[in-house]
Amino acid sequence: MSFLIPNRGVGGTKIPLSIIVLVLCGFMFFILLYTERISLLSSSSSSSSSFFKLKSCPRKDVSSKPKEKIRKERSEILEVLDDRFEFDPEECNVAAGKWVYNSSIEPLYTDRSCPYIDRQFSCMKNGQPETDYLRWEWQPDDCTIPRFSPKLAMNKLRGKRLLFVGDSLQRSQWESFVCLVESIIPEGEKSMKRSQKYFVFKAKEYNATIEFYWAPYIVESNTDIPVISDPKKRIVKVDSVKDRAKFWEGADILVFNTYVWWMSGLRMKALWGSFGNGESGAEALDTQVAYRLGLKTWANWVDSTVDPNKTRVFFTTMSPTHTRSADWGKPNGTKCFNETKPIKDKKFWGTGSNKQMMKVVSSVIKHMTTHVTVINITQLSEYRIDAHTSVYTETGGKILTAEQRADPMHHADCIHWCLPGLPDTWNRILLAHL
């Protein structure tokens, strides 16, 4: 029996139902195919879905590539992903968050690939067997910090001077920044000049410099060069930055820090005027009082000299020390020695960080007429008891001997940090603000 439907058209011709069904099926198939094509095109334009749906390459293909090439490829992919995020410093509290372990993280450099790292910070080269400290990533609670992009950094620095001013911790941040960007600059297009106090890395292609000026107190002292090892003999000239500030003038970006040199546990010998008479005229002051006077002198220089329309000013908060393992519940431990993981307790605050000193910084900056951006590294660094140089460092220009490493109570450095390492995160935050 054939099923026919009447044709309402001219001539009254009838069309078999089977043909109509076949035509409708073909039409629906075409619609589905077209829709799927549009869907595929849409998904390919979305970096978030396309990257996360990529299948991993076969292991043999990955292992056959040079590590530096793999590191570069991963960095480029992550840069594309991070383009989806906009960092708003007004909305993002970088101090509140947690360290997340990510086994896929590869540093943008190593202490062997970057020739500018002091041996003091070259933990891997100095025999550090652990690498997990390189795999922790800082994740704020309410925002995302873009990954460090060397190309973006150098484009932002094109035609500019970036100058770090401060102590050896600030020097490690400077070395970190240089190492993060130097690999994208051709060999003949970069140079490094070092003196006792002043260090300049130049990227000719970008007409940019990344500089460091050694000033552990920011204000002048009798222990800059040469360093006086006995804290009792150190004198701080709390009323002047004149001699050193001439090196700072004209910089487009200034990043200051000063803290650990003030924390000797002794009262500070403060001087007004000339060093010509030695300790004569020096007055012993409480640390916080001397610190405030020194920072006010710095603030006065910034307010009177820096043109905020041309120069941006940053201040990095104190880098914590971890010399008392009882702080994190290990009374029988040996400072930061043999620590392999960050502290998880978000409320942790060790004895190596002085909140009153932090309040001094906040108070001084609050009353400045020039805007100063504070890079708060303290809380996130508090958790990183695992990232110090520990016994994988040098002292007196020499790598620690086996005997010295076996005595971490006297030789473990729980003040400075390995490179690559934690200072890379500081620079990730700095770049996000630029």
Curated annotation (Swiss-Prot):
One of its GO terms (biological process) is xylan acetylation. It comes from Arabidopsis thaliana. It comes from the Eukaryota. The gene is TBL3. GO terms for molecular function: xylan O-acetyltransferase activity. The chain crosses the membrane at residues 15-35. It holds the Pfam family PMR5N. It is a single-pass type II membrane protein. This is Protein trichome birefringence-like 3. Keywords: Golgi apparatus, Membrane, Signal-anchor, Transmembrane, Transmembrane helix. A motif (GDS motif) lies at residues 166-168. The keyword Transmembrane helix applies. Contains 2 motifs that are conserved in esterases, but it is unlikely that this protein belongs to the catalytically active pectin esterases. Disulfide bonds: none annotated. The keyword Membrane applies. A motif (DCXHWCLPGXXDXWN motif) lies at residues 413-427.
